[in-house]
Amino acid sequence: MFNFKKLFYKTSLYSQAGQDLFAYELFGLNGTYIDIGAGDPIRGNNCYLLETNYNWRGFSVDFGDSNEDIRQNLKSRWLKHPERKNKIYWSDAINFNYMQGVNENSLDKNIDFLSCDIDPQEKTLMALKKVILDGIKPKLICFETDFYREKKDYSLLAYNFLEPYNYKIGVKNVYSNLKKNKIFETWFLRNDVDFQTIDYSTWVKKF
């Protein structure tokens, strides 16, 4: 069945809210990324399109799960997709050495895109802080807040941390799969990226 929403809205075959499309709009071909909490190699993945269609380089970090069977199942799914040539580290995102990861993969610390999405949200914030404190300077950060269900405003907490490092809010009130009641992310940009703050409902419309 034809999806009429695609006529009017920016929708990705892979990411939940078009994070990959936004990154490509900003930086085009041959970009760089770090994907924290990558999850499935394709479904819901923010960097699959960028790596396989647009020649982006980078790496993913995902512990998997505390349940070893679930963790091994996720690892096996990645092995079934050889088109995912960029490295994935099966590691704890909070204690991972991101500068070492950047160096091992011949990347620059000024990466284009950081996707930050692990559970619970407190750990997502901790992982974000670890990246920045390791000296990495992403131009775009897609940060999961799960605002629709969290008692804390993790978007505000992330902004309060990032603002002294010269970041601004790029896209606010990002919702999942065109469900306006499911605000779950904020997209931050470095101040040197020429982009004015907008609401996601404005960005996601094609016309």
Predicted feature descriptions by range:
Residues 1-14, 207:
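Membrane-proximal basic amphipathic "stem/tether" segments
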Residues 8, 90, 112-116:
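Surface-exposed cleft-lining segments at the edges of enzyme active sites
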Residues 9-99:
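SAM cofactor-binding core of SAM-dependent methyltransferases
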Residues 25, 103, 129-132:
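Short amphipathic alpha-helices and their capping/turn segments at secondary-structure boundaries
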Residues 48-49, 56-57, 109-116, 120-207:
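Conserved acidic-Pro-Pro-aromatic motif
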Residues 101-107:
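Conserved amphipathic alpha-helix within the SDR
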